[in-house]
Amino acid sequence: MKKWQFVGTTALGATLLLGACGGGNGGSGNSDLKGEAKGDGSSTVAPIVEKLNEKWAQDHSDAKISAGQAGTGAGFQKFIAGDIDFADASRPIKDEEKQKLQDKNIKYKEFKIAQDGVTVAVNKENDFVDELDKQQLKAIYSGKAKTWKDVNSKWPDKKINAVSPNSSHGTYDFFENEVMNKEDIKAEKNADTNAIVSSVTKNKEGIGYFGYNFYVQNKDKLKEVKIKDENGKATEPTKKTIQDNSYALSRPLFIYVNEKALKDNKVMSEFIKFVLEDKGKAAEEAGYVAAPEKTYKSQLDDLKAFIDKNQKSDDKKSDDKKSEDKK
């Protein structure tokens, strides 16, 4: 099994060294494809990309995919700057980010690669918080509810220790929009999701939120909280409730790709094709949820049409040039 390294675990995020060599997984590197595609972005999406690269590297030892995990917002900044070919994101691109790309004449393609459920969890020893609605969550994360008793009069009068990702993360943006109605999050913030999990496990009054796979990996140390929808139905995050969107904090996960990279970088276009043909298997292996199969098929059809169109355009330009040279 190939081992993956995290380099530079600073506040700016770690970088995954991916697909750099064929490894003890039986990979013979039998592809003629050579080159590199660079990405950065969501730490939530990073485990999926890692799983994809375990498979990719088996047959593409000379086609490298490097992907950082600086956070969705930081990834989009690099994408806008033209420093990377693709950006991993745990939220849709914002209007202001779209505008900055437009101002730089950078066109992009959006690919939905999986689904996630932002999971709210409390300490394993918490025996009273089983479910919350969004208003209660908002009270906790706005700082208006200082103690559990402020949330529910039947709960203990003990100070809540709320922890949140910081604003560089798409998970933060999602929570801010879906729960806070864009009101400020007033809680301890951390760039490292594993540190958030650790904080909740160590503090009996702790509460935090993160991607579903972080809960799955730590379910023996955490207690998940059911979230009530607008009709008051409390639902826990599972693969089924996340995929059918019955879980109130379900969300899609994305890869955004620079169109120029899709046209000019064969490694980039082949990797995205590979991602879509995987049909969410890597996402499932990483602890997330595959999108409906038709989602991958329609996106793959669109990608192939885009590549074919540009190939025909390039062929025409080549033929025109040859004709000019003969004159």
Swiss-Prot record:
Membrane association type: Lipid-anchor
**One Gene Ontology term, aspect cellular component:** plasma membrane
Can you say where in the cell this protein is located?
Cell membrane
**Record-linked Pfam families:** PBP_like_2
**Lipid anchor positions (N-palmitoyl cysteine):** C21
Positions of disulphide bridges: none
What are the GO BP annotations of this UniProt entry?
Answer: phosphate ion transport
Lipidation residue positions, type S-diacylglycerol cysteine: C21
Q: Does the keyword NAD apply?
A: no
Record CDD domains: PBP2_phosphate_like_2
The answer to whether UniProt assigns keyword Transport to this entry is: yes
The molecular function terms of the Gene Ontology recorded here are:
phosphate ion binding
| Major subcellular location class | membrane
Q: Where is this region: Disordered?
A: 307-327
Q: Which UniProt keywords apply?
A: Cell membrane, Lipoprotein, Membrane, Palmitate, Phosphate transport, Signal, Transport
Q: Which family does it belong to?
A: Belongs to the PstS family.
According to its UniProt entry, what is the function of this protein?
A: Part of the ABC transporter complex PstSACB involved in phosphate import.
Its subunit composition reads: The complex is composed of two ATP-binding proteins (PstB), two transmembrane proteins (PstC and PstA) and a solute-binding protein (PstS).
Tell me the PANTHER family matching this sequence: PERIPLASMIC PHOSPHATE BINDING COMPONENT OF PHOSPHATE ABC TRANSPORTER (PTHR30570), PHOSPHATE-BINDING PROTEIN PSTS (PTHR30570:SF1)
**What name does this protein carry?**
Phosphate-binding protein PstS
